[in-house]
């Protein structure tokens, strides 16, 4: 876990769809996580540079930088390479899933998704971190 309070892990959520961004944030905040939000890829990386999250939930298709590109940049940097990443996407082809894992993602969730399942996956990854 990062330097954040151990009882409130910090989760970065990045999605250009405000409804999904708020749905995910609401669910994870209710579960006790501290949340930071980004509406595009550049904003997501800026937030990471300001405060390392314990986990990132990234939409694949966003303006400026995709979730794949953000994940690759996180993995290439010594200070961020261990941040767990969950990708969210409507892209469901096997090649898209493969691209997600090749970029360094820890999990890949297809939209539409269950907020409860996402919460369980976040918890499972953080429990192993």
Positions of the model-derived regions?
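Acidic, metal-coordinating helix/loop segments flanking the phosphotransfer/catalytic sites
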Residues: 37-55
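Conserved Asp/Asn-Gly motif in the active-site loop of CheY-like receiver
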Residues: 38-42, 97, 115
């Amino acid at each position: 876990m990062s330097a954040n309070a151990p009882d409130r892990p910090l989760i970065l959520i990045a999605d250009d769809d405000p409804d999904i961004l708020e749905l995910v944030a609401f669910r994870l905040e209710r579960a006790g996580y501290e949340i930071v939000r980004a509406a595009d890829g550049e904003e997501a990386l800026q937030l990471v540079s300001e405060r390392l999250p314990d986990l990132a939930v990234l939409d694949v298709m966003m303006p400026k930088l995709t979730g794949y590109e953000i994940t690759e940049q996180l993995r290439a940097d010594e200070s961020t390479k261990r941040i767990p990443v969950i990708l969210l996407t409507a892209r469901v082809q096997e090649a898209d899933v493969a691209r997600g894992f090749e970029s360094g993602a820890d999990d890949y969730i297809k939209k539409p998704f269950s907020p409860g399942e996402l919460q369980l996956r976040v918890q499972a990854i953080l429990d192993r971190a």
